[in-house]
Swiss-Prot record:
Active site per database record: E564
Gene3D superfamilies from the UniProt entry: Collagenase (Catalytic Domain), Neurolysin, domain 3
Designated name of the protein: Mitochondrial intermediate peptidase
Residue span of region Disordered: 27-59
Enzyme class: hydrolase
Amino-acid positions noted as binding Zn(2+) in the UniProt annotation, renumbered to this chain: H563, H567, H570
Amino acid sequence: MAGHMLMPLRRRPWTCRACLQRLQQPRRSLETAASPSSQSDVYDYAPTNHSTQKKSNDETLRRVFDSQPFWREFSQRSATQSKPTGLVQNQYLTNPDGFRAFANVSLQRCQAIVAKVLAASTLEEYRDMARDLDRLSDLLCRVIDLSDFIRVIHPDPRVQEAATQAYALMFEYMNVLNTTTGLNDQLKKAASNPDVTSYWSEEEKIVAQILIKDFSNSAIHMPPNERQRFVNLSNDISQLGSNFVNSAEPAKSQVVVGANSLRGLDPILVQQIRRWNRTASVPTTGMIPRLALRSVHDEGVRREVYLATRTSSSRQLHRLEELLSKRAELAQLSGHASFGHMTLSDKMAKSPEAVSNFLTALVGSNREYVQEELSKLQAMKGGSPLQPWDHAYYVHQRVLQYSQSRRSRELSAVPEFFSLGTVMQGLSRLFDRLYGVRLVPQETAAGETWNPDVRRLDVVDEAERHIAVIYCDLFSRPNKHPNPAHFTLRCAREISSEEVAECATMDHSAHPNDGMATAVDPQSKTLRQLPTIALVCDFAEPPATGAGRPSLLSEHSVRTLFHEMGHALHSILGQTRLQSISGTRCATDFAELPSVLMERFATEPAVLSMYARHWQTDQPLSESMMLSMEKDRLAHGSIYGAVENEAQILMALVDQAYHSIPADKAGQIDSTAIYHQVSSAHSTLPDPTDSRPPTSWQGFFGHLYGYGATYYSYIFDRAIANKIWEDVFQAGKAAVDREAGERYKNEVLRWGGGRNGWDCVAGVLGSANAANANGRLAEGGDEAMREVGRWGLGRDGVSG
């Protein structure tokens, strides 16, 4: 896959532009599915008494996650179905060989669209072009996104292999598209013709511009020799980046100290690393050095361990500097001043200078809190100045003091009120209250899921219309990837009548959405493919017998689940007509906003009172415990939150500094000198500059590859989310207010990536907001970035 020219550079031009991350319908004939008269068939269990059905669904939602016996009974209702369906209802994926068929059918459809676009000559054909190319993107996404997910999540090696082959086939074809200059020429011809663009919808114009930008970044317009250089550089960057991420190593593998100087560290650990001559070898990677920095009383030992854990090997630094050099050359070849300029041109920030304005303003808005935190640690240390290797030690002392308090002990009971089913119930109730959509558990057909533990939820609106499908794979199992994530398996999109007719001429069982969920839009009467989402977490499984506790979540896990459901909500409500801009397919520095904002709802008292109940007694979480939770968050935030924020800001500043290097300076990059310049200028507790060798923490900063020039995005979205929380949801007072929810939905969520992010922010805050006087935020630019920096990040520390 390293041969694909765009992978290391930016998102794939023909596929997902998303964030870093992703009722059994009776089979109907295509004519029925597309017919407005059959609208009730699309979502087939609209109850006669909505409130009774709603209450029943609400209770079922809790029980399918909390009770294994209930789940087994619920999921077996459709076990008698003789004909199995395919994975996620995809009609091709009933066995491993189905992946090949799925890829081949999709490939043939792609080739037909490419032939149509290349042969276009009439005004009507050029007017179809944006929609045709969006469908081409969708066909590729259908295979690539789903295969990429299944090859990682499915337990059967045969299915993994088949999915990998389907993925590779479509990826290879995408490489062909990237070098098909005729597609670029035809699209540019269409986009420059006023008789075409005046006919296009706003969505079509946006998608055309996105694709033109992607083509330009794939070197398609360059002479053959330059294009080959571009391909070679891209391949080099891909290889270097992969090596950089996977080969991080310290300059020294261990620090040898006197065993007696490790007082404070767990004696069992000391025994493990003790040597025969009364010394001990403290490793410089893993958990032991982190524990040593928190607990060893001897400052000299902490200093040695700290410096060693932040000093990279020279090989790793060479990898990074070569990566940065080749990225600078790639940008120059593409006509940009730097890699940062190239990467940011289609983001909200637009330029490295604007990002630096934002980050510098953020340092200022955070500085007072940092000094407040450090002054308390300095008071604990006493005479000599606080050093960077002191921070973890004194923070740990403060946390220990706090954790011995009565309130902290009281909070150990909080997870009893957060069974997984209860939290899912809370999410559904919150979505219903704010946006008029809710989660309804649905039986799965044989073959529909990759593991028996996967629950399916249908998302329905207030008219009981089916609008999305979520597959929840939330329980731990051997060899499962532990990191929580949201995956878009299929994007929302309008299916044209031509596609329906095309299916009718194929095999009798062909379906315009491959058998996956569809619905008829009540306004336009057109058929739509519904977003299909997978939510993956790693929570403890409830006991098989049903006796004992269900899966109980910590407050952190609750926030994580709300975060991932924030991404899902963007996919659910951002249902555009074209898939290239649906849901989370928006600018990278806007994609985390819905998920970060959702975290704020998780522990807001008005929201907690809607769902937090004891798993055994059904008693609601008391107001006093809610207050204790809030005080606990504030206490921890005031101990280390601002310093955590500063660390994230510094990482983003380092990322910008590295990726703003022009090509003519790329031959002599000293990444360590740049790191120390940024740290000395902006850090309140910088690494010393006189240690030999100097610290080189940048060698451990793996995100420099995957998030090159965009690491600021997460904290940028945090600042915007904080502002929306404070001003639209009134710092929680309007957390369950429908008017606030509708405003946020209509100004932000429903657009997906089909509206400039600054217009979304200006729209949701409103022109009466002082930060957006006269709607000035809509213009974006340097001053808007500075303004967001002034909003700050609050005191919670880095969440998620």
